[in-house]
Amino acid sequence: MPRKGVTIYDLLLSCPGDVTDYLEIIKESVESFNRTFGNLNNIEVVTKHWSTNSYPESGDKPQELLNKQFVRDCDAAVAVFWTRFGTPTDKYGSGTEEEIEEMLLAKKQVFMYFLNSPINPSELNQDQYQKVLEFREKYKDKGIYAIVDDKFDFQRQFTNHLSLYFL
C-alpha cells in the first residue's frame, strides 16, 4: 500500500575522488535511517550523486550542467574530504567546493566531514592536501564540519547527524 504524506528530501553526495568508498557508507546509513526512522515519521532521504543522477548534456561548463540537472534541487548535502580537494571549476577550487557553496548560498544544510586518517606519504599530493587544509581553515568558525578518524567513526557520526537534522 502506498504511503500517503511522505516528505522526500534529496541529499547531495559531494566528495573528491579519494573518498569514493565513503559514498557506500553514506548510502548504507541513509537506507538504514529510512528503514528505521523514515517509515515511522513519513520521511524519506534520497541520495543524489553525479555518477547516478546526471546525463550527457552540452551547452555549458560541466559543473554548471550538474548544478542545473540536480545539485540546486537538493535539500541538503554531505561532503567528505581527506587528502584531495578535487578538480577546479571556473568559479571554485573544486566541484565539491562549488556544490557546497551552492548549497550554503541557498541556505541549505551541509554535513561536512574531514577525515583524520593516516596516509602513506608516497601517495600524498601535497598541493591537493594543502587545499583541503586551507578550505577547512576557511570554514573553521562556521561550525559546519566534523573531524572523523575512520570509516566506523564516520558512519557513527553521520548517522547521528542525519537523525538529529531530519527528525
Q: Model-found features: residue ranges?
A:
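C-terminal interaction surface of TIR/SEFIR-family domains
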Residues: P2-R3, S117-L167
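A general structural detector for well-ordered alpha-helical segments in enzyme core domains, enriched
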Residues: L66, T96-E99, K131, F135
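Extracytoplasmic/secreted cell-surface and envelope-processing proteins
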Residues: D21, G86-D90, P121-E123, R156-Q157
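Solvent-exposed loop/turn segments at secondary-structure junctions
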Residues: D18, S54, R84-G86, S117-N120, ...
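Conserved TIR/SEFIR loop-to-helix hotspot centered on a Trp-containing motif
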Residues: S58-P62, T83-L105, L124
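Generic beta-sheet signal
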Residues: V80, Y113-L115, V148
